[in-house]
From Swiss-Prot:
It comes from Picosynechococcus sp. (strain ATCC 27264 / PCC 7002 / PR-6). Pfam families: GAF (PF01590). It comes from the Bacteria. PROSITE patterns: PHYTOCHROME_2. This is Uncharacterized protein SYNPCC7002_A0852.
Amino acid sequence: MFDRSLNRVNERLNRTLTRNQLLQQATDQTRWQLRVSRVVIYYFYREWKGQVIIESLSQSEFSILGSTGADDCFNGDYAQRYLQGRILQITDIEASDFDPCHLDFLRSIRVRADLVAPIIVDQRLWGLLAAHHHEVRTWLAEEVEFVRQQAQTLAGDLQLMD
């Protein structure tokens, strides 16, 4: 009985390690491809409450690992748009129509340009793949498509792991 319990714990641990390795590779690849300051995966652990669980950085000063983000700003309306496949692309947050709550949060983590794609697993919003840049940046169509495809690939891989 003890051996079986230990095996189950080890299996869960291996799945978690494999999942985290997959997510880390995807964020590293995305940051390298886009040449941005930071790429993160924001995971929703309950309805519209989440945390940055993986990040890839150009410089350690950009770290927000473990951040719970602007949970008070994110709501069902935002979630619904992402569930419908919305890709958020902002060239300059200062010229955007973000609400003050969201804008203040992005400023606090030194985001100037933002590109975000949903990670949808089993028809639920599992998380967000977000590319942040500390300077104004115009996102190219192929960059937007790359991030969309990365998020879809991650969603498929995560679904297979569960």
